[in-house]
A protein has these predicted regions:
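Receiver (REC) domain switch-region micro-motif
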Residues: 132, 158, 290
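NAD(P)-dependent Rossmann-like dehydrogenase/reductase catalytic/cofactor-binding core
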Residues: 303-361
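Rossmann-fold NAD(P)-binding glycine/threonine-rich loop
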Residues: 137-153, 161-182
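Gly/Ser/Thr-rich loops at beta-strand to alpha-helix junctions
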Residues: 12-18, 137-142, 162-168, 189-195, ...
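N-terminal glycine-/serine-/threonine-rich beta1-alpha1-beta2 phosphate-ribose binding loop
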Residues: 1-147, 235-240, 276
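Active-site-lining helix/loop region of Rossmann-like oxidoreductase modules
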Residues: 11, 50-53, 64, 72-78, ...
Length: 361
């Protein structure tokens, strides 16, 4: 019989981790049939939000390592919205592996904790972790792949919240399939964030017969994610992920010079808020121009946590069903760069079919 808890470890105890941990506490008494702001599924399959238990935090920052997870999520430089107190969880934050996890700008504000890297694979086994969530900084290619090896060795499911291509990689997808383990990813698509809004508008233009000529999506915010992305060398996979998430909705070729999607700047006073500007220029009936402009303001990390809170439960369902490799439906709805792209309404139905057991994809 499956364990009726979802035991979750977190790599990278930053703002996204903070919102997720707060959210589990905040929504623990949510009723299954309520319409609840910020929640798609109070109960997802057999698992209510209160069934999510945290087992381990992994970080390198001296302000977090050695603390309880409930304390570390509020340590500097975290600066997201605090919407819930969190009691002591008796969940340690241990010293992780750095590799390329700290870039130029993060390295200026983060002091690495002393000591050696913890035995991550053994800790995941010892804590009976089911699912590991990756919240490392953008550009952490080597670090992510190092952690993936530990996760496979420990026998855990993997939810990849960042734009390092693991679930969408044929090599890594096969590694998880061969190990008999599920993976969801890559690069979390927030509840109502820049990517899904841009995708839906793109689909609307296409479905209504408006040819898309040019578009941009500019994003800026005040958290460490945007600070890190000032280092343009770390942005390649992020730009690919965000751009393809939009252009995959266009069934015809569009000049790459006419599409610009990506992070733009770091504005410290925005803290964990993100502001997004989207412009779309199209041609409609009679070759008449049609232009659209939109501004979106969100708190970045709660916006992602509302999706991750479902993704970890889908990963546990996949474990329960002994599914292996990339899980296509949840990956396509919850992430920017899944192994296979679907229109969002199709992906949404695939998630519901997966949850209900009508489909194992």
């Amino acid at each position: 019989m499956a364990n009726k808890k979802v035991r979750v470890a977190i790599i990278g105890v930053g703002n996204c981790a903070s919102s997720l941990v707060q959210g589990v506490q905040f929504y623990k008494n949510a009723k299954n049939d309520d319409v609840i702001p910020g929640i798609m599924h109070p109960k997802l399959g057999d698992y209510h939000i209160k069934d999510i238990e945290f087992t381990l935090g992994i970080d390198v920052n001296v302000t977090k390592v050695g603390k309880d997870l409930s304390e570390a999520i509020f340590a500097e430089p975290n600066n997201t919205y605090k919407f819930s107190d969190v009691p002591n969880l008796n969940v340690p934050v241990v010293r992780g592996m750095t590799h390329d996890g700290l870039g130029k700008y993060l390295g200026e504000i983060i002091t690495k904790a002393p000591g050696s890297t913890a035995n991550i694979a053994q800790l995941l086994k010892d804590t009976h972790t089911d699912v590991v969530v990756n919240f490392l900084p953008v550009g952490s290619e080597m670090a992510t792949k190092w952690y993936v090896e530990q996760i496979i060795e420990a026998g855990c499911a993997f939810v990849n919240g960042i734009p390092v291509f693991i679930a969408s990689s044929e090599y890594w997808g096969k590694r998880f399939a061969d190990a008999g383990l599920p993976i969801l990813g890559d690069d979390i698509k927030s509840q109502v964030g820049a990517t899904i809004v841009h995708r839906v508008l793109t689909s609307l233009f296409v479905d209504r017969g408006v040819k898309i000529d040019r578009t941009y999506q500019l994003n800026f915010g005040g958290n460490t994610d945007f600070l890190n992305m000032l280092e343009r060398e770390r942005l390649e996979s992020k730009k690919i992920s965000k751009t393809n998430a939009v252009t995959s909705m266009i069934p015809y070729e569009i000049d790459p010079n006419n599409v610009h999607v990506g992070p733009s700047d770091h504005v410290p006073w925005l803290t964990d808020r993100k502001w997004c500007y989207i412009r779309m220029e199209g041609t409609t009936f009679g070759n008449v121009p049609l232009n659209l402009e939109l501004k979106l303001e969100v708190w970045d990390s709660p916006n992602s946590a509302g999706v991750i809170i479902d993704a970890v439960r889908c990963a546990k369902i996949a474990l329960d069903r002994e599914l292996a490799g990339p899980i296509l439906g949840p990956s396509s709805y919850f992430f920017k760069t899944p192994p296979k792209q679907f229109k969002d309404e199709v992906a949404h139905q695939k998630v519901e079919d997966f949850i209900s057991g009508k489909s194992d994809e």
